[in-house]
Amino acid sequence: MKHIPRKRFGQHFLADQAIIDAIVRAIAPAPGQPMVEIGPGLAALTQPLVERLGRLTVVELDRDLAQRLRSHGQLDVIESDVLKVDFSAVAANLGAPRIRIVGNLPYNISTPILFHLLEHVGVVEDQHFMLQKEVIDRMVAQPATSDYGRLSVMLQWRYAMEDVLFVPPESFDPPPRVDSAVVRMVPHAAPAPVAPRLLEELVQVAFSQRRKLLRHTLGRWLEARQFTGTFDTQRRAEEVPVADYVALAQACA
């Protein structure tokens, strides 16, 4: 029986074989590698991956799809909301110090998923995700551009990222109303040591009114923390490089 895509799960199933082949080439799975796929759906990407890996763990929220996937002898199915999955525990269960994570992420919750995975980055080898193109543009954006923001800073602090493949709407069933792309995310081997929650709070305050000078937002936040160091608040949030935000968070710790 044909599965009807569910809007509440943000389901858009990949159906273009040429795009699927290109994604698999970008991921380059090798036999025996511990890999987790988020949102396998109708297994368009799952099947070519598991053929190369031998075994694959998948996270699927849709009960009907999870039931279908369980009939595949080479898949280990976690039926769950991805935001509730402890990826560190998944890695431990696989006996792997690091896991590779891939997926066609639901566009309606892609940013929360990225922040959730940030909490488990210590067990991540790399990540390849299909996302809304405009989200990837924000992820890889440079300072002094309109796309540069909280997502750019938080993810660039922890990952090296690149946009590896453009995916048009007609590659999906049903077609989304937006362009898509695939991003590769590789954790930095030695990221600057900083408390993630502190950096996130600092960056959120900075970008809360991005058109204003930082003295009106971050300046007041720093005053409240009785910060005595030096930081140029005569700039707008989008003009401050990632390294400066990280250094400020370190100074505030």
From Swiss-Prot:
EC id: 2.1.1.182
Protein's UniProt keywords contain Acetylation: no
Entries under Pfam families matching the protein: RrnaAD
Keywords: Cytoplasm, Methyltransferase, RNA-binding, rRNA processing, S-adenosyl-L-methionine, Transferase
Binding sites annotated in the UniProt record for S-adenosyl-L-methionine: H12, L14, G39, E60, D81, N104
Reactions catalysed according to its record: adenosine(1518)/adenosine(1519) in 16S rRNA + 4 S-adenosyl-L-methionine = N(6)-dimethyladenosine(1518)/N(6)-dimethyladenosine(1519) in 16S rRNA + 4 S-adenosyl-L-homocysteine + 4 H(+)
GO cellular component, one term: cytosol
Intracellular or extracellular location(s): Cytoplasm
Gene3D superfamilies linked: Ribosomal RNA adenine dimethylase-like, domain 2 (1.10.8.100), Vaccinia Virus protein VP39 (3.40.50.150)
Name of this protein: Ribosomal RNA small subunit methyltransferase A
Organism: Paracidovorax citrulli (strain AAC00-1) (Acidovorax citrulli)
